[in-house]
Amino acid sequence: MRNILVIFFLVIFTSAVNAQFGENRDTTFGDVRFEARFDTAKYETTFTIKKNGKKIYEENLTDNVYDILQEQFQPGGKKYFLIHLYSGGAHCCSSLLVAEVSGDKFVVLDSGFYGNSGFMLEDLDKNGTKEIVSGNDMFAYAFTNYAETRFPLRVQKFENNKLVDITGNFKGDLIYELGFFEEDLNELIKEGFACPEKDDEDTFNTDAGSVKTILAAIVADYYSMGQVERGYELVEKVYKCVDKDKYIKILKEDFKLK
């Protein structure tokens, strides 16, 4: 059920950011004030931070400041500023700055790129620590169109001032998600799909491309669980096309799924 909620959130997120793109922001947390002013002529954002009324930071951003939050990742822990940026457009791109104000300096501790998916903060395992949950959009447009692309689960934690991938800690969620991916895959297999005639033939917008993008997401989920060989066993079983070896090489070398 959890991944259904994540997918639902991503759909809502995409609609929301497009509706709010270009809006100005003026947010205050304690003695720190954040202002974001979007210039429609230059298509850029002037991002200003003031502490006790004194300007301590200003930068022109090519992205729109979608949201500014102050969050604790652990109960009673340190509070950080989360700056959610969005580039605009139907399918791209969302990113996150995790920052703090130290003295009179605005310091970006780490950043995350979420592409088309967006992200949400949620305590997935109910242990009191919030995770950053997203769909990994690394396969967007890689094998077929955006609508057919699958977004495998990605979970990060913020620890020691760094965003750390901990997707593999959520094996139950990954298995649950794999069930949906495999259901979609079996439907395509049942209907049948035409293989490319040559190993360099483009499979974009074809059924073979759809099979590739689903298999890629399955391999990614198995990779997160430390069982990537199971994903490739399924590729060998299902995708018997002339470009299979090239496809596997792309997954291993370009996407580092090995």
Which residue ranges define each predicted feature?
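Repeat-based blade/solenoid architectures
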Residues: 59-68, 112-120
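Sec-dependent N-terminal signal peptides
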Residues: 4-14
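Structural motif
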Residues: 43-46, 89-97, 141-154
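Acidic, small-residue rich beta-repeat scaffolds with periodic aromatic anchors
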Residues: 19-33, 37, 135-258
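Acidic, glycine-anchored loop motifs typical of Ca2+
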Residues: 29, 73-82, 123-133
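Surface-exposed loop/turn elements that mediate protein-protein interactions on large endomembrane-trafficking
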Residues: 46-61, 97-113, 154-167
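N-terminal targeting signals for Sec/Tat export/insertion, comprising classic cleavable signal peptides
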Residues: 26-57
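Residue-level signature of beta-propeller blades and closely related beta-rich strand-turn architectures
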Residues: 85-87, 138
